[in-house]
């Protein structure tokens, strides 16, 4: 199982969504023969340092990330009719420079984009994308939402935009979580991957 690495994990810092305890995650990963794992809490990086230390203490390579919220328009727009919804996106730091960019994005999501949730937008994502790996996220991701609305043209447009920004560091995220809609989305994501070479 050494070739498998979890890249989308929520800890106790993902309120109402994460049951994993940071100190227990690397212990379990080691038991399963894994040599790396990521932390991607919702909108925050509060557990990053504790996660890093716990992984290092257990011989696991820590990958610091975040499941950010992306504003539908800009991070400055705060109209309840248009801006109360948001999409999810996974960002993973490749190195220290990526960690700095991720920290900047998460900080700006609170100081400039907070509206119901800490939000970024595509403008600052373009500005601070270097040394980050980007994954399309869960069913709440922008591409997956387009697929669920049966709008493959929009899914293609969004996937192409992210590929244009992140290049080979952009991935379509396949999940096997037992959710019926996920099965349909996975099929369409595989189709998009082949079509757009992602």
Please report, for each region that a protein language model flagged, where it lies by residue.
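Phosphodiester-processing cores and adjacent nucleic acid-binding clamps
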Residues: 1-198
